[in-house]
Amino acid sequence: MEKQKNISIKKFANPLSFPHEFRTNLHKSTFLDASLLELPNISVDKTKNENNFSITDKILMESLKENEFKIREFIKNQESGNRVLMIDKNSLKELFNINDNQALDLIFNQYVQSTRPNLIRKSSNSSLNIDLKKEIKKKTKKSRKSFSRNSKLNNNDSKIDDKNDNYIDKINDINNFNSDIEEIFKKKKEIENTLKIPIGGNSFPIPVEFNNNNNNNNNNNNNNNNNYNNNIDNNNNNNNNNNNNNINNCNNNNINNDNNNNNNNDNDNNNINTVDNHDDDIINNSNNFNKNEYPSSNISPISPKSSISSFPTNLNNSINNTGSMVSDSLSSCRNSISSSSIDSSVASIPITIQSIDFEDKNIKSDQFKIISKSNIENTIETNPIPPFNQTNNQCEVQLQSHSLPTILKQPHIYKSKSFSSSINSNSKIKKIKKSRSFEIESKINLFDVINHIYLNLSKVGSEEQKITSVFKLYDIYDKGFISRDDLKEVLNYRTKQNGLKFQDFTMESLIDHIFQQFDKNMDGYIDFEEFKSELTINNENKVKEKEENTNYNFKEENIGIYTEKESFHSLKRYLKIEGSKLFFISLFFIINSILVITSFLNVHANNKRAIELFGPGVYITRIAAQLIEFNAAIILMTMCKQLFTMIRNTKFKFLFPVDKYMTFHKLIGYTLIIASFLHTIGWIVGMAVATGKPDNIFYDCLAPHFKFRPTVWEMIFNSLPGVTGFIMISFLIIMAILSLKIIRKSNFELFYYSHHLFIGFYVLLILHGTMGWIRPPTFWKWFIVPGFFYTVDRSFRLFKRTHRVEVLDYCLKNERVINLTFSKPPSFDYKPGQYLLINVPHISKLQWHPFTMTSSPLEDKIYVHIRVTGNWTKKLFRWLSIKKQLQQQQQLYNNIKQQNVLPDGSNFIINNNNNIDQIDLEIGLKPFRINIDGPFGSSSQYALKQKQVILVGAGIGVSPMASLLKDISLKKQRLQLLNQGDQIALEQSKNEITTKFGLGNLEKVHFFWLNRDQHSFQWFEDLLIDISTNGNSNLPKISINTFNTRVFPKNDVRVFMLWNGLDKLFKAQGLDPTTNLPFKTHWGRPNWDTIFQYYSKKYSGESISVFCCGPSQLSKELYEKCRYYTCLKTGGTKFYFHKENF
C-alpha cells in the first residue's frame, strides 16, 4: 500500500495539488510553500543563515534570551485573553533591557508601523493617522540609515555607542508637553468628581444625583429669554411642584422651593459620573430632555475633593508655549446658590459651554446654552437648568485629561469671541489633534514583538531548538503545555491577523481536529513531547526531502545564470514572442527618423530666407512640426476600437499587435508631447533672434503676412500661430497630467473628460499653419486618412452599435462589487472575454465606462461585475442602494395592502437616509435602463485556440476568465445533451453544432484566482461550484486554483496549526471553511517558477497561452516567466502571454 502511494505521488507530482482531481491519490502536496503532512518544514527551512536577520532582529533575539523570565512574568501579571498587550517605548526598554536609545527608536518605530490597525486603532484610516504614518516612515527611514551606518563602523563592538543617542530626531518629540501640563495629567487620578465631554459636543448631559422623595412630580417651567432668567415655583400640592429659577450670568442664582408635604433632606456627597456618548446619542439626549422632568428635592452638594486652585491659572499660555495640548482642567462657576429641600433623582442636564475664557480660572459665560443641530450657525435655544445646592458659594465642574482636546476637535460649534481669541489659529488645533492621535498610536503590541522573535528563532539552531521556539509561540504564558483555551486564543489572534472570519462552531470543530491530531494521550493538553513527536520527520522522509530540496536548489541556483549561448537563446525567445510588436515599433522609429532627415534637407534647400531671419532654430521647429503632423495623425488609429475588434476576427490578427494598441497609443503620445515642446521653444527663440535683424531681411521673409513690423510679443501672443500654439500645448499638458495612473484610478471622470480636448486640439492644429509663414499648411494631408477611419469607427459605434437595455436585476455585494444583469439585445453578438461600454443616464449622460462581460454568449442575459472604486462607481452604488431600498419598501407596502391591513388611500412614507443628489422617488421605482456600446475585442477571446490555457485573474480581474469558464461549462453541457439524443440528427447537424458549441482543440484550462479577502471568492461562487462538480466529466478539463494572498503561507510557523486544522476540517466536510467552496484555497502567493517548471515538463513540445487580467506587477511577472521558460528547440514548451487592456 505504501508503495502504491509513492507511485501515485510520483505520477502526480503536481505543485498545485488540486483536491478535486487527486483527492484519493495525492497524500502529499509538493507545492513549494509547504505540505500538509510536513507542517512547518523546519528541518529544511532555507532561512538558516543567521546573517539573514537584520540588526534589530539580532538585538531582540539576544535580549529575549537574556530577559525571557522577566518578560514572561510581566505577561503573566498582565494576562490578556485576546493576545493584545499594548506597551510604550519605556516599557519595551525595561523589559528587553535595551540601553541604546537609537536602536530602541528603530525597533519601536518598526513595530508601530507593523502593528495591526484593528488591534490598536479605532480609526486608522483618518487623515491624522495617515499623516502620522508618513512622519513615522520618514523618521524611521532616517533612523535606519543612520543606525546601519553606525553599525557598520562598529562591527567589532557588542553594543552601539551610547554617544549616538542624539544622532537622530526623536519620533516622540511631539508628545513632550509643558511641565505644567504634565502636572495636570498626574492630578487626574486624584479627581473623583469628574465630567467627561464626549466627541461631538453639540450638547452633553451631566448626570447629577438628587435625593428622591417624590416619584411623581410635574414640573412647570417658565423661561424668560430676554433677561436670561429661569423662574421655577415648586408647589407640591397634590404632588404638583412649581419651580422658579432665576439664573443670571451664572452668578447669584436664587432657588425658592415651597413644599406643603413632608420632605426628607438628604445631603450626600455626590460624584458626577463620566458620560461617554457619541454624537447621535448626545443629540438625542438633548432633544429628548423634557422641561417637565425637573425633580423637586434638595440637591446634594458636590464634594470638592480636589482643589481647583492647584491647577495652572493661565491655560492659554500653555497652549501657546507647547502648541500641542490644552490643559484638561476647567475651572468652576462661582455661583451663589441657595436651596431648600428637593427630592433626589438623577437628571440629565443638557448644556453646552458657550464661552470659555482661558485667562481666568472661572467660566465667564452669560448662560449655559444649547446650540440647535438644525441650524448650528444661527439658532440658539436657551434651556432652563435645574437648581444646584449651595456648597461654599461655589459650583465645581471639572474635566478629565482627555476632555478638552475632544472639545477642540469640533471648534466650529463655539461662537464666543473669547474662545476664538484663545485659539489663535487652526494650526494649533491641528497640533493638539496630532499630539492626541500620536498618544494613541505610540504603543505597540508586545505579543507581536515576541511572536516575531520566536519566528526568527525557529529558523536557527538545532531541530530541537527550532521546535522549542515554535512551541513557545503557542505556549506564550510558559505553562509547559498548550491548553484548549490557549490554542483558541492563539487561533483567534491569528485569524484576525490574517483577515479571516469563522463561526464559533467552526472554530470549535477546528480545535477538536487539532487536538485529535496532537493530543496523543487524550488528556486535554498538548505538552512539548506530543508537539515534538508530531513535528518530527522520520529519517526516511528526511533523506528524500533533502534530495528533493537539493534538486530544487540546483534548479533555482541556475536561474538567472546566462552564458553567451543562453543570452542569444533568450534574445531569440524574445523575438519569437514579441516579433510583431517589435516590428511595428521599429517601423514607427524608422518613419520618424526618415521624417527628421527629409525635413532637415527640405529646410536647408528651400528655407534660406527663414534661416537668415530666425536663425538655426528653424531646423528644430520644422523637424518638430513634421513629427507633430505625423504622430497627431496616426494616434487616431490607436483609438479605433471597432476596427481592432474586426481585425481580431480575421486571419490578420497575428500580423497586427492589436493587443498592444495601448502601448502604441502611449508611445505616440509621448513623441507628440516632446515634439510640441521642441517646436514651441524653437519658435520663441527664433522670434527673439528675429528682433535683431534689419527690416529688409524681415520683410523679405514675411512681407506677404505683415504690412507693419510687429514686436516679438505681438508675433507670439497676437498672431494666429502663436495663440493656437499656446492653446494646443496647454491642451496636451492637461491631457498628459490627467492621464497619469494615480489620477485615472482615483478620478476617472477627469481623465475621461480631459481626453475629449483632442477635438479642439485637431481643430486648432488645422488652423495653426493656415498663415503659412514658412510654407503652406500640410497637416490636412496627413489627417485625412486616419481621420476618415476614426470618423467611421466612431459613427458606427454611435449610431449602429448603441443599445438601450433594461436592467433585470442587480446585486450589491459587500459594498465592493455591483453585479448587473440586463437583457441581451437581439443583434448583440459577442465572444467570451470581450468587454462593452456602459452609460448610466441617471449618474451621467456623457460618461461611458468599460466593463468585461462575465456571461456566456449562449445565455439570453448579460452579466457584468463592477468593482466600486472611483467616483462614478461609488455614485452608482449609492443610487442602486437607494433604489433597492425603495423597491423593498414598496414591495412591503404592497404586501401589507393586499392583506387589507392598511385602509385605502393610506400614504406609505419612505424614509431616505442616504445622501444622493436629488433622487426622485418615482424614478427610483421605475425600471432601470442603461445604454451599452460594443462589444469590443480583447485578448481573452483567443483562449480557445490552444490545447493548454492558463487563466490568471486577480480580484475583479477574474471577470473575463469567468466568462470563458462559463462559456466552456455551458458548451460542455449542451454537447453532452446532444450526444444523448438522436445520433442521425447529430451527424446531419455536426457542422452547425461544431460551429456553435465547438471548443476547438482545447484540452485543459488551468484557472488561477488571487484574492486578498476570503469573501471575494463568493462573487462567482455558483460558477466555481458547478465547475468543480462537473468540470472534469469530459474534455476540456478545468482545474481551479484559488489563492488568498493576504494570509501567511501555510508553512509559516505562526499559522501552521491553523492551516492543519482547516485541512482536517476540509477533509471531514468536503468544503473549505474559509470560502465554503468544494476545493482547497492556497494561502500566500503562488510560486510561478515552480508552476511554470511543472507545466514546461508536463506539456513538453506544446504551446501554452497565458492570459492575465490584474495589477501591472502581476502582469509583468507573468510576462517575464513566459519569456524565460519558453524553449525554442524542437520538443520545447512555448508560452504565449496575453494581457487585458481597457
From Swiss-Prot:
Residues 172-246 form a coiled coil. It is found in: Membrane. It is a multi-pass membrane protein. FAD binds at residues 849-855. Residues 148-157, 211-275, 283-298 have a biased composition (Low complexity). One of its GO terms (molecular function) is flavin adenine dinucleotide binding. Keywords: Calcium, Coiled coil, Electron transport, FAD, Flavoprotein, Heme, Iron, Membrane, Metal-binding, NADP, Oxidoreductase, Repeat, Transmembrane, Transmembrane helix, Transport. The lineage of its organism: Eukaryota, Amoebozoa, Evosea, Eumycetozoa, Dictyostelia. Heme binds at residues 665, 679, 755, 768. The chain crosses the membrane at residues 583-603, 627-647, 667-687, 720-740, 754-774. CDD domains: EFh (cd00051), NOX_Duox_like_FAD_NADP (cd06186). Residues 135-147 have a biased composition (Basic residues). Its cofactor is FAD. Residues 794-942 form the FAD-binding FR-type domain. Ca(2+) binds at residues 519, 521, 523, 525, 530. This is Superoxide-generating NADPH oxidase heavy chain subunit C. It is an enzyme of class 1 (oxidoreductase). Composed of a heavy chain and a light chain. Residues 462-497, 506-541 form the EF-hand domain. InterPro entries: Cyt_b245_heavy_chain, EF-hand-dom_pair, EF_Hand_1_Ca_BS, EF_hand_dom, FAD-bd_8, FAD-bd_FR_type, Fe3_Rdtase_TM_dom, Fe_red_NAD-bd_6. Residues 135-166, 208-298 are annotated as: Disordered. Residues 622-766 form the Ferric oxidoreductase domain. Its EC number is 1.-.-.-.
